[in-house]
């Protein structure tokens, strides 16, 4: 009964179903084991291959050692001649091998290209669908429709990228499949664990059911009891438990079936994952093979590139060495030519001497036919002639001696350079002493200023006395007129009484009465027309010191006299004895409250002077730091006493008699001894002016050394005249105390202060040196033909300022000084003087204002150059040695400026180079008005004036012109070298590469076309700016476009993101308009527009052709992209165009070698115009049919 209730449960199916996942795991394990074994086998093969490689290398090394040993034995065994022959044979073999290698490389390149094409065709056929559009696009973009090697490489690169992307996708799918397999294995293990747990529970429950049944049977048998109520109850409970267990077993079976189905699905998915993994591995192996092939090809290409780069670098080094050797040979050739010229000159001189001697010999032979003594002399002379011939024959030996002397001079130059290095310490010590002396001189200047201010107050107090003196003078003149009228009346009465005509006595009166009383006073010239007061004073004659008061210039009297004062006395010229008194009178009159100058005038004047002193001090400090020569010069001049020499010169020399009216009527009052006006000899023009202005000429008076002494034969003075004479003496003493020729005197003007003055004159400072030198230069030879030039205040007079206050001056004072310097230059140019006739201040003003030389060079020229003749005759070595200009470009700047001024100011200059008035130059106002009214007719004049006036100086070139060309990176080099518009056409390639650091050939080409643009505009800066403004908003006149304007045009096309690439690229309007070989592809390359962006390139091509056709004279060839026609040579292109902007007159006017373009067809171009490939850069693309590809560095 128990057997019927509890049937057996078959577990065979369950066990069979549980074996499936274990078998799947076993298969996976077997697969992993096979993969590991395969990996180990591959590693073993790799190790074997590495071992074989190591053994091969070892064997190769041993063979190399054997080869070296055999070569040594062979070299020992063979004789020397055979070795030389073998060397030559080896050289020939090496050359032959090099040629064969080149041929093999070319063949390999061709084979590689063919193999690459075949491989590409295979790959394209394999991946035709993915690469079809790319190939079509690339063939459409290429001009000729033929894919080149670069296109093949690009296609290979895209193919490799495609394979790489496929490999990544396969790897991603493999990784996902492996992750899914791992998850399924985990689920399988969990299900297996659950089944095991269920089996254990079933086994436990079965054992539990059997044990209670056995126990119940035993109890019944033991007790002998039958089946009662307890057994029925127990069976019912067991049946319920059995039903429950059957239900649970059914549920477990259902769950097991579900797990089996899931297991089968997992196995299927695992199989598919294994298949996909195999496919992925196959694809990966193929991709790895392709990648290895591509890497091998890439390594081959890199090796070829490295060999080409090495060959290029070696060629470049050889080229540089050849250039250096060429430069050395050129220098040696120039030196040999100079020596040869010197020898020719000497031989020519010897030949002339020989001819002269032969002529003299013939003359002596004719004269000495009968004289034996003369024959002896002739024999001696013949012997001397023979000696001369021998000397002439030994001329080559003398040349050798000269060469040896040249070598000795070079050695001396080296020793001098060593001495220059050793003198640096000496310069430092000298700078300390100079600083000390400058501080001491500054203190003395401050004391001097205080004393001058006290003297100024005394002058103001004396001005009232001067007014009183004027009143007394007026009264005296009235008394004189009354006395003269009485004398005439009395004489007429006497004549009437005696019966003589009055005219004869009136005519002889100046020679009778007055000449007897005042015999030493010079008389007036006959026929001079005088004013009433002039006539009275003329009759009275000059009475000693009063001549200084009566002979003051009329213009100064007119400026200083107040309204309602007396008419001025007659104008005359001061003699040497009365100049100091006249200066004192003029200074007091101009500084008096009644005049138009007061204390502020003197303060401003002192400020200007002290500012000039400080400027000179700074310039001296900069000079003494540069070269040994300037330091020695400073030392010698600082140790000298400039003020003593100045005082000695002024005390020993007398002034010439011609002190012009324009000199005394200068804008600034003569406040110091250094403002002594310039002197000039009398000229007919000035005599005519004097006659027109009623100015009588007088003879020169006593020298300066007579001082304020009154002649002893003057008439006995009246009390009023004695008082006037005492006031005149006091005024003369005060004027002498305020003179700037020496240090300040006491405020009282006493004799003690006069005796103390020589002690203060020995100030050993650079101030005294400068003032002494400049005073000597000013008082020197008055050899000038123009009175107006002589009366113009010079630069040294205005800049030399012994008592100025530099810190108190404003910009107005600098403007005044610049205006005075401009007046100097304009006066010199208005007179039409040649450059050699210019004086030192004019030359210094020209250097500072028109040439634009730095302050230290201007100071050096001021110290060393005293006239235009000295400046014009300076050679290159003298400029370097005397002025201290060591930079060759600075010397070039100075030489070109000197050549220009010498040519433009020479009397032989053509009429076209002069203005309508016949002068070479005009003032700034005249130039601006002329250029505003008659611009087209006077282009040559404005060009030359602009160059000469310095409007296109180095600051304009560095700050304006270079940025407009798109080359602002070279600004600092151009500014350091002071490159101005004159120098642009004279810069050669060596200077551009070396000193200006312009290594890029395209940048040099860009600079050349910028210079051509300036040539076509005749270097007219205003015309350039005007045309740029006019073409700012329109597409016209592209030649004057700047780099910024070109960038704006590119931005306006919608290519703003590429426009910034033109910064510092050298692209400007002149390059676009004048370079026939520059096309849109070059511009696209500089803009860095990618070749894939076909739309932007087409837009650029269209707009570029429109720009060239509308804004330039160029004409683009429509079939240029198809026919690949070569552009015309730059030599043919520039021969005709360079001469458009230069007329024959302007070419004749220029000095030799000044404008190479005016001489015709680029006489000596400073740089090659070919567009060479920039150094260190390979071309980005190549064209078929041998077309050269230009590349521009950007």
Swiss-Prot record:
The modification Phosphoserine is found at residues 17, 142, 207, 431, 508, 640, 645, 668, 683, 737, 794, 1123, 1164. Gene3D superfamilies: 1.10.287.1490, Transcription Factor, Ets-1 (1.10.150.50). Residues 202-217, 548-559, 624-636, 687-701 have a biased composition (Basic and acidic residues). It comes from the Eukaryota. Predominantly expressed in brain. Also detected in sperm (at protein level). Keywords: Coiled coil, Cytoplasm, Cytoplasmic vesicle, Phosphoprotein, Repeat. It is found in: Cytoplasm; Cytoplasmic vesicle, Secretory vesicle, Acrosome. Residues 26-133, 161-501, 596-644, 1014-1040 form a coiled coil. Its main location: cytoplasm. Pfam families: SAM_1 (PF00536), SAM_2 (PF07647). Residues 651-666, 1157-1169 have a biased composition (Low complexity). Residues 785-797 have a biased composition (Polar residues). Residues 1-23, 202-233, 525-583, 624-819, 1157-1194 are annotated as: Disordered. The keyword Membrane does not apply. The modification Phosphothreonine is found at residues 714, 792. One of its GO terms (biological process) is synapse organization. GO terms for cellular component: acrosomal vesicle; cytosol; epididymosome; glutamatergic synapse; presynaptic active zone; presynaptic active zone cytoplasmic component. Belongs to the liprin family. Liprin-alpha subfamily. The N-terminal coiled coil regions mediate homodimerization preferentially and heterodimerization type alpha/alpha. The C-terminal, non-coiled coil regions mediate heterodimerization type alpha/beta and interaction with PTPRD, PTPRF and PTPRS. May regulate the disassembly of focal adhesions. May localize receptor-like tyrosine phosphatases type 2A at specific sites on the plasma membrane, possibly regulating their interaction with the extracellular environment and their association with substrates. Forms homodimers and heterodimers with liprins-alpha and liprins-beta. Interacts with the second PTPase domain of PTPRD, PTPRF and PTPRS. Binds RIMS1, RIMS2, RIMS3 and RIMS4. This is Liprin-alpha-3. It comes from Homo sapiens. The lineage of its organism: Eukaryota, Metazoa, Chordata, Craniata, Vertebrata. The gene is PPFIA3.
């Amino acid at each position: 009964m128990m057997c019927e209730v509890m049937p057996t449960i078959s577990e065979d199916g369950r066990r069979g179903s549980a074996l499936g996942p274990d078998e799947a795991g076993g298969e996976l394990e077997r697969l992993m084991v096979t993969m590991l074994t395969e990996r180990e086998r591959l590693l073993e093969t790799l190790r074997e291959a590495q071992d074989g490689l190591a053994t091969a290398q070892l064997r190769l090394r041993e063979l190399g050692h054997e080869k070296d040993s055999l070569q040594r034995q062979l070299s020992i065994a063979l004789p020397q001649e055979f070795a030389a022959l073998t060397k030559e044979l080896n050289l020939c073999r090496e050359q032959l091998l090099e040629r064969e290698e080149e041929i093999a490389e070319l063949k390999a390149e061709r084979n590689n290209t063919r193999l690459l094409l075949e491989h590409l065709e295979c790959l394209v056929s394999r991946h035709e669908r993915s690469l079809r559009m790319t190939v079509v696009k690339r063939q459409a973009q290429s001009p000729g429709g033929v894919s080149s090697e670069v296109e093949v490489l690009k296609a290979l690169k895209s193919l490799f990228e495609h394979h790489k992307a496929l490999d990544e996708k396969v790897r991603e799918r493999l990784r996902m499949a492996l992750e899914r397999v791992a998850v399924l294995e985990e689920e399988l293990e969990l299900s297996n664990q659950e089944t095991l747990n269920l089996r254990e529970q079933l086994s436990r429950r079965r054992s539990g059911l059997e044990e209670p049944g056995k126990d119940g049977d035993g109890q019944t048998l033991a007790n002998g009891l039958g089946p009662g109520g307890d057994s029925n109850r127990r069976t019912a409970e067991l049946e319920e438990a059995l039903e429950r267990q059957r239900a649970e077993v059914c549920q477990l079976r259902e769950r097991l079936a579900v797990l089996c189905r899931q297991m089968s699905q997992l196995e299927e998915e695992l199989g598919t994952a294994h298949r996909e993994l195999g496919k992925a591995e196959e694809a990966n192996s193929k991709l790895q093979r392709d990648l290895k092939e591509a890497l091998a090809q890439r390594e081959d290409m890199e090796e070829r590139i490295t060999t080409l780069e090495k060959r290029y670098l070696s060629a470049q080094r050889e080229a540089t060495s050849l250039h250096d050797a060429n430069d050395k040979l050129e220098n040696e050739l120039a030196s040999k030519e100079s020596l040869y010229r010197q020898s020719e000159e000497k031989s020519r001189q010897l030949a002339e001497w020989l001819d002269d001697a032969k002529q003299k010999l013939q003359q002596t032979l004719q004269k000495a036919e009968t004289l034996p003594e003369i024959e002896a002399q002739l024999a001696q002379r013949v012997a001397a002639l023979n000696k001369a011939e021998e000397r002439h024959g030994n001329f080559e030996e003398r040349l050798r001696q000269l060469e040896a002397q040249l070598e000795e001079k070079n050695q001396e130059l080296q020793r001098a350079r060593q001495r220059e290095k050793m003198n640096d310490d000496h310069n430092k010590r000298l700078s300390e002493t100079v600083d000390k002396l400058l501080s001491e001189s500054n203190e003395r200047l401050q004391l001097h200023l205080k004393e001058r201010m006290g003297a100024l107050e005394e002058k103001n107090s004396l001005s009232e006395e001067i007014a009183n003196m004027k009143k007394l003078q007026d009264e005296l003149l009235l008394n004189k007129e009354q006395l003269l009228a009485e004398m005439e009346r009395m004489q007429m009465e006497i004549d009437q009484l005696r019966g003589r005509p009055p005219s004869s006595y009136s005519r002889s009166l100046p020679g009778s009465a007055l000449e007897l009383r005042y015999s030493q006073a010079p008389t007036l010239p006959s026929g001079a027309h005088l004013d009433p007061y002039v006539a009275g004073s003329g009759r009275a004659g000059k009475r000693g010191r009063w001549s200084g008061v009566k002979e003051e210039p009329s213009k100064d009297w007119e400026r200083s006299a107040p309204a309602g004062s007396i008419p001025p006395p007659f104008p005359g010229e001061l003699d040497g004895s009365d100049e100091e008194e006249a200066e004192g009178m003029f200074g007091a009159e101009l500084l008096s409250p009644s005049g138009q100058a007061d204390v502020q005038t003197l303060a401003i004047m002192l400020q200007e002077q002290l500012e000039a002193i400080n400027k000179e001090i700074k310039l001296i400090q900069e000079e003494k730091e540069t070269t040994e020569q300037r330091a020695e010069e400073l030392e010698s001049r600082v140790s000298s006493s400039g003020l003593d020499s100045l005082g000695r010169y002024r005390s020993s020399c007398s002034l010439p008699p011609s002190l012009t009216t324009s000199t005394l009527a200068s804008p600034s009052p003569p406040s110091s001894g250094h403002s002594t006006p310039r002197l000039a000899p009398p000229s007919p023009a000035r005599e005519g002016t004097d006659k027109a202005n009623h100015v009588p000429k007088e003879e020169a008076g006593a020298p300066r050394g007579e001082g304020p002494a009154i002649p002893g034969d003057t008439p006995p003075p009246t009390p009023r005249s004695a008082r006037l004479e005492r006031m005149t003496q006091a005024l003369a003493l005060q004027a002498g105390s305020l003179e700037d020729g020496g240090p300040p005197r006491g405020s009282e003007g006493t004799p003690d202060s006069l005796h103390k003055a020589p002690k203060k004159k020995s100030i050993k400072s650079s101030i005294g040196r400068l003032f002494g030198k400049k005073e000597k230069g000013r008082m020197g030879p008055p050899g000038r033909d123009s009175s107006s030039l002589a009366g113009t205040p010079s630069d040294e007079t205005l800049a030399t300022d012994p008592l100025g206050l530099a810190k108190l001056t404003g910009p107005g004072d600098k403007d005044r000084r610049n205006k005075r310097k401009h007046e100097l230059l304009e006066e010199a140019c208005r007179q039409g003087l040649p450059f050699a006739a210019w004086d030192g201040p004019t030359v210094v003003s020209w250097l500072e204002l028109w040439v634009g030389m730095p302050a230290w060079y201007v100071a050096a020229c001021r110290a060393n150059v005293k006239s235009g003749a000295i400046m014009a005759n300076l050679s290159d070595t003298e400029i370097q040695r005397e002025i201290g200009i060591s930079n060759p470009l600075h010397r070039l700047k100075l030489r070109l400026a000197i050549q220009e001024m010498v040519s433009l100011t020479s009397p032989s200059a053509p009429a076209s180079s002069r203005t309508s008035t016949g002068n070479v130059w005009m003032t700034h106002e005249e130039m601006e008005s002329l250029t505003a009214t008659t611009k087209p007719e006077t282009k040559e004049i404005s060009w030359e004036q602009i160059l000469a006036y310095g409007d296109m100086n180095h600051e304009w070139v560095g700050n304006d012109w270079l940025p407009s060309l798109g080359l602002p990176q070279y600004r600092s080099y151009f500014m350091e070298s002071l490159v101005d518009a004159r120098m642009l056409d004279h810069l050669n390639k060596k200077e551009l590469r070396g000193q200006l650091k312009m290594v890029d050939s395209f940048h040099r080409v860009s600079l050349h076309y910028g210079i051509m643009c300036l040539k076509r505009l005749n270097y007219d800066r205003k015309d350039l700016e005007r045309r740029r403004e006019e073409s700012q908003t329109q597409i016209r006149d592209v030649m004057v476009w700047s780099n910024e304007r070109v960038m704006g045009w590119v931005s306006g096309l919608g290519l703003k993101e590429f426009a910034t690439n033109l910064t510092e690229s050298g692209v400007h309007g002149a390059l676009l308009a004048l370079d026939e070989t520059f096309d849109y592809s070059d511009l696209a390359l500089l803009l860095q527009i990618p070749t894939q962006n076909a739309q932007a390139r087409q837009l650029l091509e269209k707009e570029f052709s429109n720009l060239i056709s509308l804004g330039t004279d160029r004409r683009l060839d429509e079939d240029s992209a198809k026919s690949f026609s070569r552009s015309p040579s730059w030599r043919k292109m520039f021969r005709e165009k360079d001469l458009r902007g230069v007329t024959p007159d302007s070419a004749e006017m220029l000095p030799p070698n000044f404008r190479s373009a005016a001489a015709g067809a680029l006489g000596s171009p400073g740089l090659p115009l070919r567009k060479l490939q920039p150094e260190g850069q390979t071309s980005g693309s190549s064209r078929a049919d041998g077309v050269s590809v230009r590349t521009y560095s950007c």
